[in-house]
Amino acid sequence: AIERLKHFVSREAFDIDGLGGKIVEQFYNEGILRDPTDIFTLEERNGGSGPTEDLFAVIDDKALHLERRDGWGKKSVENLFRAIRAKRRIELPRFIYALGIRQVGAATARLIARNYGSFRKFMTDMRNQDTERLLSIDGIGEAMAKDVVEFFKEEHNVSTVNRLLEEITVEDFVDNTNYNSPLSGKTVVFTGTLERMTRAEAKAKAQSLGAKVAGSVSAHTDYVIEGADAGSKAKKA
């Protein structure tokens, strides 16, 4: 469960400022976060930030009061809540990836989003075990389709998704890909530390230009983009 939460807030998923892996682990161990929906109820559960003089009110107060914790303050808590509120609208590819469906990486999530257009359409087909459209997507085979269907057959997963949809809005997919760019249809691999943008931003930019982003170099790789401290991928290329 804790790894699922870390995946949910990872860079290519919800990517919430101030809610990295260490904080997620701490909040999980203290029972503050148990599933992704808890992230979006944090502010409501936090309660007021002012001092309480009534001893009995303190005893009965079940609010989290994150600002009273070591290493936290009113400003840092406000920043966290602001970052969470900013992610109450999320792009469809990020949401699909954030669910942590087996074998569905960020690139595959984008392909699914592009083909289905809306999360409701995708979820309805998977709940009905209708994989015809899914299997028509280049790169998705029977094994992956089975894993996707199995995810939505698990009632706990469906319950979590439905609770999330009460808290957030998943935007329908808008294809802004430039299919006339020189990178359209090309396979690109990134390696090393990029100077002007994060790896996730670079991948998103390449995909918007019609490129396919791969995780490793192969015979199908057209371009390898090297940053600082490029590793084995650059040597292999």
Model-derived segments and spans:
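Cys/His-rich short segments
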Residues: 1-16
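Intrinsically disordered, low-complexity segments enriched in polar/charged residues with Gly/Pro
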Residues: 2-3, 26, 88
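DNA strand-break repair and replication-stress modules
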Residues: 8, 50-236
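Structured core elements
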Residues: 15-18, 189
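Compact, charge-rich alpha-helical regulatory domains located at protein termini
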Residues: 17, 21, 26, 30-68, ...
